[in-house]
């Protein structure tokens, strides 16, 4: 019943497919069976299916068959630190983190690069003190000072600015199928937009982006 409702919702809203973003404790013994049933119904309706997975973790309960059912696997190469680890201030999504995630899924797990996308964050973490960490949007950093668009941190506020995003696009363009974003609503809808930065960098590589990016 759930699978049929998901497919119906996807079709009624003219979506391209479904992203299965069940994480950690939500990945239970029924996960793989659910994924395979969903894949069958989506494929019958010419719809795609992707999954978002941690940067360097493959859940043990996911079978090889279920893993291979995804059209794309989105590598969540962020949240290496955050509100759950207030005593460890620092960058939660560095270029090195992205390289590690790429290496894990492509080389250790063996997923072909054409089925992988690199997740980038449009948000950051403010390590206010040893017990308090709050998230913030990239848009808020740019709104406070336009020059923050080209930084990765201001004091104990860590995020991804345009130079790091460009480097990650280069990494993805050379090794993977594309970029995944969490999430668009956190972008600065100005000339400092990270989405526009991604679009321009891909254009440099003669890669056509979607209408969402203006190409």
What are these language model-derived features?
Residues 3-30, 75-79, 180:
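Active-site groove signature of glycoside hydrolases
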Residues 24-146:
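Substrate-binding surface in catalytic domains of secreted glycosidases
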Residues 1-12, 55-64, 159-173:
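Short, acidic/polar
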Residues 113-175, 196-215:
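Glycan-binding loop/region signatures in secreted carbohydrate-active enzymes
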Residues 21-48, 53, 163-214:
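Active-site and adjacent substrate-binding regions of carbohydrate-active enzymes
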Residues 2, 30, 93-100, 157-164, ...:
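Soluble or luminal CAZymes and related metallo-dependent hydrolases
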Residues 1-10, 89-91, 95-96, 103, ...:
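Glycan-recognition patch characteristic of GH18 chitinases/ENGases
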Residues 15, 70, 113, 176-177:
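A structural motif
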């Amino acid at each position: 019943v759930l699978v049929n409702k998901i497919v119906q919702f996807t079709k009624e809203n003219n979506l391209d497919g479904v992203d299965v973003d069940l994480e950690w404790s939500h990945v239970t013994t029924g996960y793989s069976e659910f994924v395979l049933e969903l894949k069958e119904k989506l494929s019958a309706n010419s719809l795609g299916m992707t999954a978002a997975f941690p940067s360097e973790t493959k859940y043990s309960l996911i079978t090889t068959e279920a893993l291979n059912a995804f059209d794309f696997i989105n590598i969540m190469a962020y949240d290496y630190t955050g509100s759950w680890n207030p005593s460890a201030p620092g960058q939660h999504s560095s270029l090195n983190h992205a390289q590690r995630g790429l290496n894990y899924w492509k080389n250790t797990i063996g997923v072909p690069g054409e089925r992988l996308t690199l997740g980038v964050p449009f948000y950051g973490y403010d390590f206010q003190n040893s017990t308090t960490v709050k998230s913030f949007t990239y848009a808020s950093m740019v709104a406070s000072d336009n020059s923050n668009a080209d930084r990765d941190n201001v004091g104990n506020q860590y995020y991804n600015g345009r130079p790091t995003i460009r480097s990650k696009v280069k990494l993805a363009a050379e090794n993977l199928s594309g970029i995944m974003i969490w999430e668009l609503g956190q972008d600065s809808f100005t000339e400092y937009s990270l989405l526009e930065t991604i679009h321009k960098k891909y254009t440099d590589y003669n890669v056509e982006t979607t209408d969402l990016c203006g190409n």
